């Protein structure tokens, strides 16, 4: 029993040491400072969530601008292998320049969450809070979008619950 305990302690010590080793030092995250992506731009992914898939973390969140809380861009996607260095993967769900669309530029699109559905092999935005353009918080809708193949890329939006994601 003592040999087993010693071996486990040695293994844990080695794992802690080697897991902390890296070719490149990680940049510290400083509270209260702007956190830059791989392009030196501040990460713009508010109210979002992080998912892990095939060795990579993906951060999805609302792109916010300085002048309004309305969605002027959409949902952003960032990827990271270490939770410190983030690559901008682009707009995952874009608002559109069509006032008859539920996701028209100027709508309120908040708190997007994405998961991987192993059964279908698709990445699914399991939901986001959606308010129609110019209606404030009166509509109280939820939105769903899905994508195939990779978590980074454009999500097709499915209004009125027509998504065949499951």
PLM segments and residue spans:
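Bacterial N-terminal signal peptides that target proteins for export
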Residues: 1-11
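Carbohydrate-active catalytic/glycan-binding domains of CAZyme proteins
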Residues: 8, 21-166
